[in-house]
């Protein structure tokens, strides 16, 4: 097998650059050496030091960020893009066992979601709670809080994340917690075509009906008869109350009609086009294509003149940004101090 020199940077969390979903695939075909002077760099959004590596760059994101192809040669992301051999869409929920961005096993959740429609007749008896809400990020679209408040006026919504926690204890196991509930509020932080994270899959895995908002094209991936799609009602980030009220009425209808509820549960989650095994094979093919080339042939970005000028501007901008980030905590500390002695 050929030997390849790689490195990862800016991936965030507890990412292990020697053992992750990318290295597991590459090890099927190559001998991997993780080195400081790589021939191929995988980078993400949590650092700007990728600009220090003059090698083939492969951008990966688990966030709602569009790749900058002036900086990277290849990219792995959420958006529905076509760019020759330089891009593949591989959303977060397909990343098996990738723990850098979540505390649970994606592989288990994905397999449960694929089989969520295979349930016994007494399945509904196991649902002891109405609806769950598990979030730690308060900086999200207004509609998420609006949905929580509106549904809470109908029945109690159990919030087990750091945001709006009303269960009085930290969450130990998200999957086991959500399994008790008939519904799950599965709202993304923002709404962008293609941006589908793990939230809807975790709801399916728990055997619950997702109340979903985020990717307006979600029906390209998941069966529209298997969940409540808030985009069908016209909900935007602002959380319009009259639209929220209509969604709540739909939740009430399903909550009060066991037959309709079970019919939705027994509908397969994934569309025929969203074949998980096929997407995995396409992802492998994408990676192997990059590394099967000799290094000079693998470059795609413009590395000369305008490409150099563009990258130089990025270096200056990134340096300023990261310096500002160092100052912000000091600024906030001074503000708190002045407020204390007012």
Which residues are covered by each model-predicted region?
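Pol beta-like nucleotidyltransferase catalytic core
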Residues: 2-61, 65-163, 168-171, 175-184, ...
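Flexible, polar/acidic helix-loop-strand segments at domain edges
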Residues: 189
